[in-house]
Amino acid sequence: MHSCGQILEILPHLIEAGVNVVNLMQPNVFPIPRLAQFKGKVCFEVCADAQSSLPKGDEAVIAKEIQGLLDACCSPSGGLIEVQLDRMYFEGDNVPRPIGAFCHAEYRRRDPFLQQT
């Protein structure tokens, strides 16, 4: 399921109805630490915030956001799928192209389950 908005109040009902993956374009509207209450119950498909973080291209801000998403969402039973940035982000949201590679590298570097292998 895709959401560009704040669905925190209805998310438990969506999970109960069978939603198991939520595509988030703007995770900062929740805020991110509140996503932890759903750890192990649903998987979030996300990169970083498509409106507040990615277009600015500030690597320090994006890296902190990625770490927050990993901390809030990752569990042994699932929780996060990294969205790989593509043309939609670069052309539609004005995300600088180098940020795509940066985000992927940050997820690889920070993923707690990749660190175990």
Specify the residue positions occupied by each region the protein language model found:
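Active-site loop segments of alpha/beta catalytic cores
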Residues: 1-117
